[in-house]
Amino acid sequence: VSAVDRGEVEAGVVPIENSTEGAVGATQEALITSQVTICGEIYLPIRHALLSKTKSGPIRVLYSHPQALAQCRHWLAMHLGETKLVEVASTAEGARRASVEKGAAALASPWAAQIYRLQVRQRDVQDRPGNCTRFYLLGHEGARATGKDKTSLLFTLPHRAGALHKALGVLAAKGLNLLKVESRPAPGKPWEYVFFVDVRGHVDRVDFRRALLQLEKQTQDLRILGSYPEER
């Protein structure tokens, strides 16, 4: 997220939600403090593999992203209960480390084995079949309306009774379908929360813009994170 925000890259792909573990908090927090635009979403089935430089031998340390470790926790407890688990920024970074450290392994996509010249010691080590992750496509320009779109919003609320009910009621009154609502602690503000809301529709629609004008009166720090084609 930060690389796109700083202009170091033109676009980025980040995980936002997993069907097993829920929201990816690190991505949500990065979105709060950045000015990037969500311009798309994709859903990908997640299949984790155990990778190392050799097909056999003891594994001293295992590297992977926190979400991947969580998605395989039961398998890891059963098969690698004594192995040190180390969280890294991405599954790719875990694979890279496993490729240069003796006695190290990684949880990553089988494709990473080809990139980093690793051996696949075990496939499909995720605890639940059908595990799927939703990713955001990030950039600086919004996507055009397609007729089947989704808009992601971010806002905080005033400290008064029924504030969330009133805010969401604005969307309902305008006939907008609420797809998701989730809260996250506000960075640097103990016991205050940021709300992430997904609504069906595109910000270019007249009725949607009218709803946002009303929503702005009921919320604080309202931001449109992006409108983009709905994949599901």
Residue spans for each PLM region:
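Domain-level signature for soluble enzymes in the chorismate/prephenate branch of the shikimate pathway
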Residues: 1-232
